[in-house]
Amino acid sequence: MINHTTNDTTTIQGQAIATVIADTVYKGSRITTLELVYPRYIHSEFMTHRMFSRNASSSRAIPIEKTANEVLTDPVGFDYVGFNQSGMVAAEELPEDLKEDFLAEWKLWGMQTALKVKLWAKKYNIHKQTLNRALEPWSRIKVLVTATEWDNFFKLRLAPDAQPEIQNLAQAMESAMEGSTPIESKMHLPYVDLTDHEPEYTDMYHSVARCARVSYNNNGGTTSTIEEDKKLFERLQNNGHWSPFEHIAEYWGCDEMYANFHNWCSLRNVYENMSNEDKVVDFIHKIFRDS
């Protein structure tokens, strides 16, 4: 199983796992960040929801050996297997014995593919951005998602005609959010514990870098340091990799939409809508002083 964060909100439904990482409310306006684990093959469906800010583990970044071993030990299957028919919905499920036989063959195929990928890696010395693609049908993906608007997602993905695996993901997300109590703050900082201190400027480095990794931990598996997180923050900033900056947000209110957030403005939005770096730095310092 892919490494993931767990806490009191962690909910498992089928092959989907949902955990609330940060949950913030101010003047009745709520913003929530979840860490998700789900089958890689439904990721394209999840990506169609444009009100979400997302970061995800990448097949181009994870070592071949690690991906192959995950498939060997715990290959992804299907939560529901239906008989073929016209249309997008399989109304009738296979009998349990046939379903078990199919899933056993499916997972065996994945394990055989993982062994083949390991062989190719040694034989040809091919990069992970190529070989990991062969493992995606049996792989999980870890995704960080932040949003203020969830109703349309739940309406579509909890509907009876949604693919069962994304139904289970939506159910896990809904249950995790229902089990979470938001903290009251003007700052939303995923992967930063604000229960014991007020937001600080260095929290921004931690939050952006950990959102980029989709983890509290660095690549070595230990909790990241301020030096590591600041270095990654600056590299992302200098190279224009702005997506991790979308998960950090401040309450701006006025019943306005700030990009895809209602009443909350993301750090990315701040950077992209201010004219020079000095103004951005001064503005961000003010945000943390006023929080």
Describe the function of each predicted region:
Residues 1-291:
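A conserved ligand/cofactor-binding region detector
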